[in-house]
Amino acid sequence: MTDLIRAEGLTKTYGSKTVLDRVDLRVPAGSIVGFVGANGAGKTTTIRALLGLMPLDAGRVVLFGEPFDISSDAATCQRVKGRIGAVLDTCPFVPDLSVKTVGSLMKAAYPTWRADLFEEHLRRFELDPRKKVKEFSRGMGMKLQLACALAHEPDVLLLDEATAGLDPLARDEVLDILRAFVSDENHAVLLSSHITTDLEKIADVIVGIDQGRIVFSLEKDVITDEMGIARCRSAELEDLASSGLYDQNSLRVLRRPYGIDVLVPDRFALARRFPEIPCDKATIEDYLQFVLTGEQA
């Protein structure tokens, strides 16, 4: 599949602190890529770099097949940004503006703006066009950003914690919108989120970042369908590690007060060989925890 977004070696430092460390990232057409990591790991900084909102020390961003960064000329910016819908982690609109005025400003900024589509999303999200931005909760501000992001018919959505502050029903509604968006295989979504259960519902690929460095990039189904968390005692871990069932380097462990949790790459193979060892399906949150804090078996 064609990559609508490609980041190659993105590096950014502030003084002695490296906030992006040779970040590689790709978002193919027709896909939803989930972007996970702890607060301060580099998710928001990466998205800002993709949007050309900050200079980089090294690396490059390629959007829709052409290089793009903060120094791109006005024509390139208009052409590329016109194909991107963005939802940032904080609402960027002037607090004293009404929703209707926000729509008017967006119409002036985007030649492809569709007022009818904007109004449709306002109704869907129950946003009163007469209200001012400052009257909205965090969740309502996210809905307003999403309505704006969709109303100019972009090809890519870059969403930074777009479901934060939403109740479960509203989150499911947003996920339905994203599924519909990528049903057009010329579209794609990059979604950063701490709500990993949302990503388990819709993502195709999960990318993890820690301390500015990409630490994994895997198909979501590999994590949630194939991997498992084995609940072992010390003797069982020794048997498992020495069995030859897995490459020992592929096993990671977390030592708990009640025993040892082991991340295994194939829970079905474990069940066949060691049926006496309890094993649960892995979640994205499990996998991230093992990668960041687990030990090699």
Regions found by a protein language model. Give the residues of each.
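ABC transporter nucleotide-binding domain
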Residues: 175-264
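Short loop/turn segments at beta->alpha junctions
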Residues: 98, 219, 280-283
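C-terminal coupling/interaction segments
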Residues: 250-297
